[in-house]
Swiss-Prot record:
Disulfide bonds: none annotated. The modification N-acetylserine is found at S2. Keywords: Acetylation, Ribonucleoprotein, Ribosomal protein. PROSITE patterns: RIBOSOMAL_S12E. This is Small ribosomal subunit protein eS12y. One of its GO terms (biological process) is translation. It holds the Pfam family Ribosomal_L7Ae. GO terms for molecular function: structural constituent of ribosome.
Length: 144
């Protein structure tokens, strides 16, 4: 190899996510993608005890609460902590849905979630990388 040859920089393929995620996505789908991406980066905490500790430390960026939680004191505590510490709070209709997003399930060979365990509350401490879905969630939070 002579010194006159230039070394070619490796070609990085464009991120496939930009082509997959439409700009007019609804907030629920955007929240699901945001939770899954945060989980991949280790930024999701599940359960009342861990969520309350993270909110108290003011390390939480977003709290997601299931509407069908059957413990009124649980809901009251999470809402009060989020209000006291200025943490944004979103709700989802089902604890099973939130549990699936949080990874509390088994994935079968076809990619479908099986044996989903309900999750009443989760807190995101690290969003990971900036995505279109995250921007949609942030716009929704800012508008409310």
């Amino acid at each position: 190899m002579s010194g006159d040859e230039a070394v070619a920089a490796p070609v990085v393929p464009p991120v496939a996510e930009a082509a997959v995620i439409p700009e007019d996505m609804d907030v629920s789908t955007a929240l699901e993608l945001t939770v899954r991406k945060s989980r991949a980066y280790g930024g999701v905490v599940r359960g009342l005890h861990e969520s309350a500790k993270l909110i108290e430390k003011r390390n939480a960026q977003l709290c997601v609460l299931a509407e069908d939680c059957n413990q009124p004191d649980y809901v009251k505590l999470v809402k009060a902590l989020c209000a006291d510490h200025s943490i944004k709070l979103l709700t989802v209709p089902s604890a099973k849905t939130l549990g699936e997003w949080a990874g509390l399930c088994k994935i079968d060979s076809e990619g479908n979630a099986r044996k989903v365990v309900g999750c009443s509350c989760l807190v995101i401490k690290d969003f990971g990388e900036e995505t279109t879905a995250l921007n949609i969630v942030k716009k929704h939070l800012d508008s409310n």
